[in-house]
Amino acid sequence: PLPFILSRTYSSYRTKTPAPVGSLGPGWKMPADIRLQLRDNTLILTDNGGRSLYFEHLFPGEDGYSRSESLWLVRGGVAKLDEGHRLAALWQALPEELRLSPHRYLATNSPQGPWWLLGWCERVPEADEVLPAPLPPYRVLTGLVDRFGRTQTFHREAAGEFSGEITGVTDGAGRHFRLVLTTQAQRAEEARQQAISGGTEPSAFPDTLPGYTEYGRDNGIRLSAVWLTHDPEYPENLPAAPLVRYGWTPRGELAAVYDRSNTQVRSFTYDDKYRGRMVAHRHTGRPEIRYRYDSDGRVTEQLNPAGLSYTYQYEKDRIT
């Protein structure tokens, strides 16, 4: 029933209309990073692969379809879709409140669902802010609904240094997960304290990061760990350690992944000059896979010392 699955994908592709860098760092995306930009006559959906999908402006109840990605984008505002519409039955699985809201957008890649709900983060207004505040010119993922009406909810902070960021998830089985976030300053201080306790010289770890990368604006907030904090089936048997933990470079790049036994299972290396451009990755116990890029930032070689290696050539209408 809509279990919470924290997957991640990496792409060195840089769109001209990027969404902000997510909590996994530049180049990385997870499903929760889906974001819709509302322009004057265009809607730009940034998917969890970092690509930009363009749709025409939609009136309430209208839908757009991306043939390349087999994805529908529908604007709320109607109780029912036309009976002949492929999504008519799936639309009725949504709560009436969502169907009737013209300010919400919904996306799906199958008539079987699920729906990705694109809304906005409720936040605490500033003391001198004129109310009601206008809605932001973008929409973020607030939850999922499957064809049986079961939901998965993303909880975003309403105030503070993590305002707008996902800090909790409730899945379709009622389990609650806590996402621990850190700022660049917090990671820098932790690195200094570890160096002091270990009796070593602290390495260069800046307190701030540049506000922009080739992959979009970057607020420096990163995901540190994911905890299971509530399970209705086993309320007294919660794990005493995080389900997953992440390590970061001083430049805010994802460096390592640790499982629930605190064993490192993945490692990543990046270009010294281009922040976020991965040049190598490795599964623990396996050979390191390396990448080479051309001057345009495109992968030209994939080098595997223990298996097949690949070279890529870019032509006008194909890659060989």
Regions of interest found by a model, annotated:
Residues P3, T15-K29:
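Short, polar loop/linker segments at the starts of domains and inter-domain junctions
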Residues P26, T42-T320:
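Extended charged/polar low-complexity repeat regions
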Residues P1-Y10:
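Predominantly extracellular/luminal regions of secreted and cell-surface proteins
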Residues A32:
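Short helix-loop capping/hinge segments that flank enzyme active sites or metal/cofactor-binding pockets
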